[in-house]
Amino acid sequence: MTVGDETAIFDFGNQMPKDIHETLEIVYSSLEEKGYNPINQIVGYLMSGDPAYIPRLNDARNLIKRHERDEIIEELVHAYLKK
């Protein structure tokens, strides 16, 4: 085989994307820790898509950006309406 014919391997290690519920718990607690109103900040992010609403503390900003906003909203509506 010549150089360039080999398949490159990318390893995520142990950093698999967290599920939406776990991500929201981390984001919520990070916002509380920073002294912000978590609900207002999360709604601001979901409506605008601006990650500045979410702090970098505990990697919250990077975690929430791993999920599509519409998927987060879908999960929230599902959890709210679940009986």
Curated annotation (Swiss-Prot):
Family, as annotated: Belongs to the UPF0297 family.
HAMAP family recorded: UPF0297
Matches recorded under NCBIfam families: PRK05473.1
Protein's name according to its UniProt entry: UPF0297 protein LEUM_0557
